[in-house]
A protein has these predicted regions:
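A short alpha-helix capping/helix-coil boundary motif
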Residues: 11, 81, 225-228
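Short pre-active-site segment immediately N-terminal to the catalytic Zn-binding motif
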Residues: 83-93
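Short, flexible loop/turn segments with low-complexity composition
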Residues: 24-25, 65, 88, 275-283
């Protein structure tokens, strides 16, 4: 469903829940629909169920917005695995890896807006996690796809720059960009040497709709595109090496950082048009200011600890 469809679905699932007295159902449904692009109807129902379970585990008298935010994280990325203890060296590597993704996304115009970064292990294999707020697009330009590839490669390039070595943590990233590079060259007609052709096929299929010679050219162009994006990502992060270090150090200190933390460290994203995350956070700030007269803000230390309060956060395969 689109954003209006998600909002309507949330209205249905919010009705039977015991919400905190200061929660406006209409505003909450609007906010949750903004935070859940790409979610199915079943996913939206799971968010509401998880929010109720989280509130029960925390022995909260009612469900508030923070419980829904934690529920979205859990649906996206799975359970926190604090029992999975990383060595100091591994934790540092994960922090710089995630910082590389975050800084890349911050300085690429078409990258998905960042909401939160975590180095708390989650789910089955994820050692780090980033939550983004992608725009609901139906068409993608070459520039948008290339920026997405650069952000995905940011973790591996950060490891190369800071440690002079690479780890297996980037395997999922490499799989994603290789598949995207293949689609750009073989399906979207965005490669000059192959021309405006589209070979819609599964990479694993035994029968290819092109000749062996074209297959060799396709392999060559996919590799060339990945290397071009790698060089661009290296140039970007080399110019922002100090920023990567700032973000990584804060991650090691707090384990979870938000978009507000990124703004404090790096300044606002250097692009004229506000993205969805900016608009969402501006709206969130206005709502918070409206409620200040009726309820005092939580203590600062509580704000910093909030991402760790529940045993339910979200997880995405390490970018």
């Amino acid at each position: 469903p689109d954003i209006s469809g998600r909002c309507a679905i949330f209205h249905v699932h919010l009705k039977p829940l015991k919400l905190a007295s200061d929660v406006n159902t209409d505003l909450l449904a609007e906010k949750l629909s903004t935070l859940t692009p790409g979610f199915s109807g079943a996913d939206l129902a799971n968010v509401c169920n998880e929010a109720a379970l989280i509130a029960a585990r925390l022995e909260a008298p009612a469900i508030d917005e923070s419980h829904f935010e934690l529920a979205i994280e859990r649906v996206i990325a799975g359970l926190e695995r604090k029992s999975r203890v990383l060595s100091p060296e591994e934790k540092t590597t994960v922090a710089y890896h995630e910082a590389g993704h975050a800084v890349c996304g911050w300085f690429l115009e078409y990258a998905d807006p960042l909401l939160k970064v975590s180095i708390i292990p989650r789910g089955v294999g994820a050692l780090g996690y980033a939550q983004y707020l992608p725009k609901e697009r139906y068409l993608f330009s070459t520039e948008q796809l290339h920026d997405r590839m650069c952000m995905t490669l940011g973790g591996r390039v950060s490891e190369e720059l800071f440690f002079g070595r690479i780890t297996t943590g980037a395997q999922d990233d490499l799989s994603k960009i290789t598949r995207l590079a293949f689609e750009i060259c073989a399906s979207y007609g965005m490669n000059d040497k192959l021309g405006p052709v589209s070979y819609r096929t599964e990479q694993e299929s035994m029968h290819k709709p092109y000749s062996e010679r074209t297959g060799e050219l396709l392999d060559e162009q996919v590799r060339a595109l990945v290397m071009e994006v790698h060089a661009r990502t290296t140039k970007l992060l080399t110019g922002h090496k100090a920023d990567v270090e700032k973000v990584a150090k804060l991650l090691l200190e707090r384990e979870v950082i938000t978009r507000e933390d990124m703004t404090n460290l790096l300044g606002k994203r250097p692009f004229k048009q506000a993205d969805e995350a900016d608009e969402y956070l501006d709206k969130k700030g206005r709502l918070a200011r409206k409620g200040e007269s009726s309820a005092p803000p939580p203590p600062q230390d509580e704000l910093q600890q909030d991402p760790h309060l529940a045993s339910s956060q979200s997880e995405i395969p390490p970018p």
